[in-house]
Amino acid sequence: MAAALPWSITASTILAVFWIVALALSPYARYVGRELKTVWGALPVALWALAALGTLWSSEPDWTERLKALDDFHRLWAIPFLIAQFRVSSYGRQVLIGFLISCTALLVLSYLTYFVPSLTWRWSRSDGVPVKDYIAQSGVFVLCAFGLLVAAIKSRSDGRNAAALGLLVLAFAFLANVTYIATGRTAIVVMIGLLVWVSLRHSNWRYGSLGIVLGCALLATTWTTSPYLQSRLLTLWNEVQSYHPNERTEASAAVRLEFWRRSIMIIEEAPWLGHGTGSIRTQFEKTASGQKELTALVTQNPHNQIFAIAIQIGVPGSILLVLMWIAHLWLFRRGDSFSTIGSMVVVQNIIGCMFNSHLFDFTQGSLYVVGVGVIGGIVLRGDAAERPLLRNAPA
């Protein structure tokens, strides 16, 4: 399932169904109850439960749309199930390695389709993006790059210099793809955020500050040598400057600002209960009635996860979301490499959710769920390696 995630929504969905059935029939199922008693396992389910209740008071008249909106929350159930499985299974590392190998294969194909455009097939969005879209691809590649950097640091500290060098080269191959070939602008913000996070978390203040300085120097070098990156970021500034509610524009940043402005208005109308699960489009249609230009736009996605949840199930839903993020950061509070990578999954999602509804997007949402679930299980398995419960557990 994890290996299919960078490539295909359909394949990932089919494999997820097989995984659910297999897990239900396996010895791991009996450990799920334990994880539901923890904050990191209970909060995702609590958020889902509130969304399920939200279907009862939704302003969306069509029950099909209400239940369809609830689908966006279903994947949260996978977090306690994955943690339960990989807290007792020894195959967590193999899952991560399989994911990395899959992403590396996609990286190679991305370079091939960029430098040899004739290899690009008809359903590709652009050169260098062989499957899905550049937003999903750059998000996956950024996480791989920083995960490899953490692994390289660990290898270097263990005296495995050749392995550290190889991991470092592969990490820069991922970063080069993001900065020179295909990137989402959110991915650039995530890169900066992860650079600061890893530098301060993985080192003391002295070396952390040095890491930030070196990272800034690298970003400056990339900026001066990548016209593509310059174009993406300068366009963002121009789009923000072009924003005016009563003027027509197709600039994505301006559209986001308008969606955020109207989201706040919608939330203020029903801050405590929200307008119900599935109500986003209905509420935007209401605010667009009789309007023109940007104010007449209607969307199902306000491009901010906190707003997307607050519109439907109120401020309490957004509070549950933030508490879930905090609980998952707490799960990865230790200083080992797996905890650092797990915390990066959470930080990436937090930053991404400021500009998109990433928990509701298939690739980004599944990446968060699988990352927290699998790595969380690995970390807890390491913490509890000497406990009697695990001595007779299935491997």
PLM region spans:
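Hydrophobic transmembrane alpha-helices and their immediate junctions
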Residues: Q312-V347
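Membrane-embedded alpha-helical segments of multi-pass membrane proteins
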Residues: T10-P27, A69-P80, A136-A145, I188-V196, ...
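Interfacial transmembrane-helix termini
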Residues: A2-W19, V32-T38, A49-L76, Q85-Q94, ...
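Transmembrane alpha-helices of multi-pass inner-membrane enzymes
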Residues: F18-L23, M191, L195, M324, ...
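A membrane-periplasm/extracellular boundary helix in multi-pass inner-membrane enzymes
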Residues: I181, H202-E247, A251, F259-E269, ...
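Alpha-helical transmembrane segments of multi-pass inner-membrane proteins
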Residues: A52, F81, Y91-W123, P130-W205, ...
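Long extracytoplasmic/lumenal interhelical loops at the membrane interface
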Residues: N246-R261, M265, E269, L273-I313
